[in-house]
Amino acid sequence: MKLTAEQEDIINSRGDIKINAVAGSGKTTTIIEYAKTRPATAKILYLAFNKSVKLEAIKKFTAKGLSNVTVETAHSLAYKNIVFRHQYKVRVQGYKTHEIAELLGLQGNGEKHHEYVIANHINKFIALFCNSDKLKVQDVNYLETISDAKAKTFVKTFYHFIETQTRNLLAKMDRGEIEITHDFYLKKFQLQNPVLPFDYILFDEGQDASPAMLDIFLKQAATKVIVGDTHQQIYSWRYAVNSLEKTGFKTFDLSHSFRFGANIANLATQILFWKEAITETKPITIKGLGTNNDTKTKAVIGRTNLGLLLKAIEYVTEKKNIKQIYFEGNFNSYTYADEGASLYDVLNLQNNKQSLIKDALIRSMSTIKDLEEYIEKTEDGQLSMMLEIVKKYGNDIYNIIKTIKQKHVENNDKEKADIVFSTVHRCKGMEYDAVHLVKDFITEDKVNRQVHELENDEKKISK
């Protein structure tokens, strides 16, 4: 295939570089061609963002006969170096709030569910520290991540205790007394300052790298190439930083997209310019080289599982012409919060049917009011969304979910669906002809409110 001038410049480059690649710009092709033009004796590491990308990359590098390229994820590298060496046992799904409370022997203080609120913050504190590049828990300011006023007041009051118990839980993992999390072994790997035996390291999807991942990458002596799209960061909720903006490497752009034509490219360019209203951003002009096709896939995309489910419920109950639908991933996962509570647990709490509640945290609550107070003190957005759905639809939820499952088609019949539902994380890299965004993304009002709160906090500090 004929390469663009931008691709040629990257392939012929020398030294550490960063590549800002727009959607559909032939990023993978460019990386493969870059690897092909390095010396055959060079040891090359390609760092994929997740396992599915890793498996796809292995196929592509193998097909090109590039036996000198090793494909890993940051976690698979850490797993081999930490888990095997220390014979740790890994907890696949992480710890739930009630499990942390039990492991640490947290006690109530008279306030409702005090120990669970504390445990919830410990869980998030650990995630923040493990994804950071900091050396000690004390170096991380967890309070900065809290925006809700009631949650912030709670954390301020109990900060020292939350921090101490965060350290205690990490120490239990370190000693092998309990199973370790994926975040933990990556953090331990970063703290050991590993030296990776490669001449070149190609770091893909760099815009979603955590500070811990970036720290490992930047400390290597190898020639470093970081690739990504500064406008496609979707893992900031996992404390990712836009690593392309954190590196001082020479910058190359891949601005020609083969995925869509000029109309979409021009619209995308205009939308990206809007970012200048909230942050400093380098303008980029996208050139659409793609051609239209006859596929007419319609998709609804949300930020959260439950926000998407709420929109799907609206479609099923209000739009009678929708006969077949498809959810990217397992549909059942859309009715659960990350920690395990299901929509039915919250519904059973509202109906005072505690004996039917499976999740330990929800089962510990007596009323919906208890759940509302817990949500206020923890900023648990997923439980808040569940509560909203239960209050809006009540016992109709049973028949609504049943109807959704009846309309849902299997993977091999996806193209027959009238509409596809997906979160932004599950549909990354996929293509749809028409997209409707659910209103669960951050709004201008919320951005302005957070800026106002930050300015007020800064004024208080300066006094």
What do the PLM-derived regions correspond to, one by one?
Residues 19-29, 49-52, 77, 195-196, ...:
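Conserved helicase motor core of SF1/SF2 NTP-dependent helicases
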Residues 1-87, 269:
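P-loop NTPase Walker
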Residues 87-169, 352-377:
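ATP-hydrolysis module of ASCE/P-loop NTPase motor domains
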Residues 344-463:
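Conserved helicase C-terminal RecA-like lobe
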Residues 33-40, 59-63, 187-191, 215-222, ...:
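Short, well-ordered alpha-helices that flank and scaffold nucleotide-derived cofactor binding pockets
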Residues 2, 153-202, 208-219, 400-424:
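Conserved helicase/translocase P-loop NTPase motor core
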Residues 51-126, 319-320, 325-333:
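Conserved P-loop NTPase-based nucleic-acid remodeling module centered on helicase motor cores
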